[in-house]
């Protein structure tokens, strides 16, 4: 069942499935931000965020930097 899978995933990876996916998305965004000149909303869309503002919040929470700070 779902709770069993969630527990096993967290036991294996140390984070919830949702957190794992979020981290992978932010990792992908870092590569895109460094290698392209795409606008922030385009990067957000490319990695699966529908809201670029929420993407920026998640990015800052995970990296400790704003998107702008990271890109400089």
Describe each model-derived feature in a short phrase.
Residues 1:
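Histidine-centered phosphotransfer motif of kinases
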Residues 4, 39, 53-54, 66:
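Residues in the helix-turn-helix
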Residues 5, 9, 54-55, 59:
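Short hydrophobic/aromatic patch on the recognition helix
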Residues 11-53, 72:
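Terminal helix-turn-helix DNA-binding modules in bacterial transcription factors
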Residues 57-72:
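…primarily DNA-binding HTH/wHTH and HhH modules…
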């Amino acid at each position: 069942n779902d709770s069993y899978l969630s527990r096993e995933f967290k036991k294996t990876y140390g984070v919830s499935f949702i957190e794992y996916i979020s981290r992978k998305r932010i990792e992908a965004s870092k590569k895109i931000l460094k290698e392209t000149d795409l606008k922030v909303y385009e990067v957000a869309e490319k990695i699966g965020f529908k809201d670029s503002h929420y993407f920026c919040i998640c990015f800052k929470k995970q990296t400790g930097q704003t998107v702008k700070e990271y890109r400089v």
